[in-house]
Amino acid sequence: MKIINLGILAHVDAGKTTLTESLLYTSGAIAELGSVDEGTTRTDTMNLERQRGITIQTAVTSFQWEDVKVNIIDTPGHMDFLAEVYRSLSVLDGAVLLVSAKDGIQAQTRILFHALQIMKIPTIFFINKIDQEGIDLPMVYREMKAKLSSEIIVKQKVGQHPHINVTDNDDMEQWDAVIMGNDELLEKYMSGKPFKMSELEQEENRRFQNGTLFPVYHGSAKNNLGTRQLIEVIASKFYSSTPEGQSELCGQVFKIEYSEKRRRFVYVRIYSGTLHLRDVIRISEKEKIKITEMYVPTNGELYSSDTACSGDIVILPNDVLQLNSILGNEILLPQRKFIENPLPMIQTTIAVKKSEQREILLGALTEISDCDPLLKYYVDTTTHEIILSFLGNVQMEVICAILEEKYHVEAEIKEPTVIYMERPLRKAEYTIHIEVPPNPFWASVGLSIEPLPIGSGVQYESRVSLGYLNQSFQNAVMEGVLYGCEQGLYGWKVTDCKICFEYGLYYSPVSTPADFRLLSPIVLEQALKKAGTELLEPYLHFEIYAPQEYLSRAYHDAPRYCADIVSTQIKNDEVILKGEIPARCIQEYRNDLTYFTNGQGVCLTELKGYQPAIGKFICQPRRPNSRIDKVRHMFHKLA
């Protein structure tokens, strides 16, 4: 059986969840249509998803059409969740990108199409809601060519009499994009030679599979118009990316979720081989797991199964496998360009409104962060505050909704701030000697610190020989230094520097590794005070697509948001701006873009890295640190 893993992507409210329901219903997988408005759909499982009409988490369902099984990955549709969209894209064989006939090309549509192009995934356009009043399809086609790709091929005609309908487009004009993209076909066309239809279809299929030509289909998912034709196209046009002739197992985890009973499930795409119940599978050089339970999506539901074939998706109850874990032979994993998850750039504190729910909150955050690589948290050992780091503001809204709906926890979140870092300004050295007051430890430690280029991270080197100071003492110094790097002079993590252990002395038998471990952060702190530190803040690359009249406004607003526009291009009455901007300014910049372009502007961003902070920034008060504060107090007391 041919298995296709299909992604459905769209801007908010374009109808992708409704289309999923229509595909399941038309194929016979379900007997009754679910409704987004009534909250009865198979894929949107959270109240927030139903209330706002957006998909937040990736859901998996399936249907069968003749001898083809189609697994539908109903991917998220909000900009703050593109990281999960990218992760979902990595398991797809193809995608359907919805365009609302009424709303046209939205900013989110362009961002999703951009991601599909980067991943080189074969894509079909489905123009939805064609039965609404005031639809101008020729204008939608023009907009698609201008804002998405000129390489579209309109495969259907839309009629109005006696009622709205879709039929095959047999006009020769539809093949223009195919002919213009092939020199041999273009030469035939220019010389007036006849074409064989098989030549055109073969070239269309080649370019479609390469992700450079995009067929356009039409319908109304809400009324099941055009759904059957779309199913037939999906079953015939898309191919499974599973390598042929491979019997050895290879699979990869692309999603983790927890059930209401707190069972942990991992979603695995099988790329080759077959997974059987009771198989013992290697997941690393030293670790294996036994498959004791497994489920596969079948006709709109999940069913227990004894096998999962190549190309299919399998759900395993498992507490060991992590996102991107590989089952079996890693060499057989398809070589596809993956997009790395960006680092969280924002942090805040979260607290429960009812103190008795604190442990429930911590357990919930552990599960949520396990499922979402863009969320991290830790508990301050002294203040006991729960510190969250994440990527976007809407992510916080979703976390609060999950906490309330799934875990029944009411939480309060403080105003978030950007995560800064610190780098030494110059080289400096500092030494604290044994038996020299106020040093209370049986140890001498001398450290040097110097700045490195931004992006280098922390590099540690010991210049004290093991013959002079044994390994346990050396390890203790390194542990103390790295611990001390957690907070610099402004309370942020220290990075992009080289720290050298220059001098050490111990007294036998009274010295212990703890003496070196406790003294090292104090020495590092003094070295940092001599060196001074500069604040670094996260920067983003941005790419803005907006109406040409926005150009002057963009340059006018750039200094206000510390943005640096490095290139400008005019294309099809549209301006394309590229540049860099501090992450702390991007949300307001985006809001202004949306406001001044009436929602037509698009802003694509990716993390550039950290750069010296400019303009107004927020210093973080030094967090109480029981270990270092106690040692610091001892020094002051003995001084």
Curated annotation (Swiss-Prot):
The record ties this protein, via Gene3D superfamilies, to:
3.30.230.10, 3.30.70.240, Elongation Factor G (Translational Gtpase), domain 3, P-loop containing nucleotide triphosphate hydrolases, Translation factors
Task: Indicate the segments forming the tr-type G domain, all copies.
Answer: 1-244
The molecular function GO annotations come to: GTP binding; GTPase activity
Q: Provide this UniProt record's keywords sorted from A to Z.
A: Antibiotic resistance, GTP-binding, Nucleotide-binding, Plasmid, Protein biosynthesis
Cite the InterPro entries for this sequence.
EF-G-like_DII (IPR053905), EFG_II (IPR041095), EFG_III/V (IPR035647), EFG_V-like (IPR000640), G_TR_CS (IPR031157), P-loop_NTPase (IPR027417), Ribosomal_Su5_D2-typ_SF (IPR020568), Ribsml_uS5_D2-typ_fold_subgr (IPR014721)
The UniProt record gives the binding positions of GTP as: 10-17, 74-78, 128-131
One GO BP annotation is: translation
Note the Pfam families from the entry: EF-G_D2 (PF22042), EFG_C (PF00679), EFG_III (PF14492), EFG_IV (PF03764), GTP_EFTU (PF00009)
Q: Which PROSITE patterns match?
A: G_TR_1, G_TR_2
Note whether Methyltransferase occurs among the keywords: no
The cross-references to PANTHER family, in alphabetical order and at most eight, read: RIBOSOME-RELEASING FACTOR 2, MITOCHONDRIAL, TRANSLATION ELONGATION FACTOR G-RELATED
**Known role:** Abolishes the inhibitory effect of tetracyclin on protein synthesis by a non-covalent modification of the ribosomes.
Q: Which NCBIfam families match?
A: small_GTP (TIGR00231), tet_protect (NF012153), tet_protect_M_W (NF033148)
Q: Which family does it belong to?
A: Belongs to the TRAFAC class translation factor GTPase superfamily. Classic translation factor GTPase family. TetM/TetO subfamily.
What protein name does the entry list?
Tetracycline resistance protein TetO
Organism, as annotated: Campylobacter jejuni
Whichever gene encodes this chain, its name is tetO
